[in-house]
Amino acid sequence: MADEFGNGDALDLPVGKDAVNSLIRENSHIFSDTQCKVCSAVLISESQKLAHYQSRKHANKVRRYMAINQGEDSVPAKKFKAAPAEISDGEDRSKCCPVCNMTFSSPVVAESHYIGKTHIKNLRLREQGGVKEGMVNQAKKTRTPTVATKSDNKMDHSDRAKFCKLCHSTFNNPLMAEQHYAGKKHKKQETKTQIMTIYTSSGQTPAQAPIPLNLNSPMPGSGSAGKGFSCDKCNIVLNSIEQYQAHVSGAKHKNQLMSMTPLSEEGHQAVVAPSAIASGSAGKGFSCDTCNIVLNSIEQYQAHISGAKHKNHLKSMTPLSEEGHTAAVAPSAFASGSAGKGFSCDTCNIVLNSIEQYQAHISGAKHKNHLMSMTPLSEEGHTAAVAPSAFASGSAGKGFSCDTCNIVLNSIEQYQAHVSGAKHKNQLMSMTPSSEEGLPSAVGPSAFASPLSAGGALSSGGPSGRGFCPSGDLTPKGPSSFGSLPPLGSLLPPLYPPAHSSQPYVHDDTMSPDGYNYFNEDFE
């Protein structure tokens, strides 16, 4: 192998067996016939040895190795073409990067490296003191990793720049430590530790005793740190500190704590005995023996015992004594088998769900109508039109029947409106001829049912070819000229006048009650 490098772009390769053996003898500390320490290659044959030492890959690795260890006595200085002092900084940058321990085959590759992220990151670390200056110290540090690890282990719990006790994280340099302490993970762990310390040492709610310190809960530096937030009272694990805070301040956690001790608030003991709270359902809900239900939380339980349903169940166990209620419904209706299930009205044969519904029912029209249907009405005018038996008939409880009109009304109001209306009165009048003054006998129901004999031969559609009007007007008038009177045949003159008269036929019989004169225009 030649003793010198070229211009830095390539290394002169040994040619032939003698040149290879000479290279091995000159660099026996790194080369041998069976092993190349620079390439970490094991050579098992003569041909493999010659091929390896004459390869370009081996020459590049040797050049990189010498560039890194150029200050060591073990590497001969004659391997380089010129001394480092004779080489400018620009030429050094194009050959190798002492910061990243890299060599380059051309200035283009070197320039690409210097503008890359890796070089910029390593340069920043070196400027901040993370990477020691001097490649000799770097080489020693890389050659003795065991010693460095031992020294780091001694500083695990004392050097904050190399170890985080809270997160159990180690750092290679101060920059990594600063990034960690300013990061989200470390801040979250700090918040978690603070919250857990507060809730496990001095946290308490108004309705409970102080929570005892839980040794199994996540504490700073414990093994469970970073894996969740446990609540031993509710036997659950929360994923974040926000969820834990929401849980311990929520109703479920408070109910779980309160379910372990009977309630002592004023007013609750009178409604439900403490045994209902401390019963076998403790921790699973709050039972109300009166209503036979279980509530999920103390808030629901308090709302239940102060609500209408619970009060109605309590009232249903004792007959009502309010004025006016006992008269309509006997106390036995409340003490019957339906107690606790509703309020029954024997009058209407229905069951109400609450005392409010019952009170509204007995004061309503339906209940009053049923009461009135059991006794004949005594109001003036009603009994004359409808017999008392109409109220006490089989339709009682289902409506109010009118035998005159053969209909059934749903309420007493409808019945009263019916008997005072025109339809009912007309039905009564149609059963007996009217005798009121001024109404002709022909206007009765029979008058509309059949034409009179006087005009039986005429149709009711009015005269044909004859005119009739008030005061002798010759203009023919239709049936509407008579107002509300129907065009009856009895009001029309006969077809022909009597034979003994030559005067126009006007007879007293043709005078209508309204003063109409009926005549035949053929007889003038």
Swiss-Prot record:
Name of the protein: Zinc finger protein 346
Zinc finger (Matrin-type): 34-64, 92-126, 162-192, 226-260, 286-316, 343-373, 400-430
Designated gene of the protein: znf346
Compartments reported by the entry: Nucleus; Cytoplasm
GO cellular component, one term: nucleus
Residues noted as binding Zn(2+) 2 in the record, renumbered to the chain: C97, C100, H113, H119
Region (Disordered): 453-486, 494-513
Biased composition (Low complexity): 476-486
One Pfam family cited in the UniProt record for this chain: zf-met
